[in-house]
């Protein structure tokens, strides 16, 4: 029989408290799942993207978003054994909102780190 092409994908979303880059414990299982995915597909590299809401100066938010992305990368490397060279932390500040910054709920959704991976493989 011919090999069957399959697609595997995973999406990580970690939200943050206001003005914080501390990854909360509730996201550790999600990080574990991403780490297992990366171990299964060992040639994959991933951009870990940090974001903020629009509260505060734009340049501060750019730095905060970078710190958020780096916090997730640090956990993946130090707690879950992923090689640092496979991960790139990128801070996008407030430039890519997923919700309105006019509401408390919207701002909470915008304070996030995202990583999305998709891979095609044969079985």
Task: Label each residue range with its predicted role.
Residues 1-45, 78, 82-85, 118-123:
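Periplasmic peptidoglycan-binding/tethering modules of Gram-negative envelope proteins
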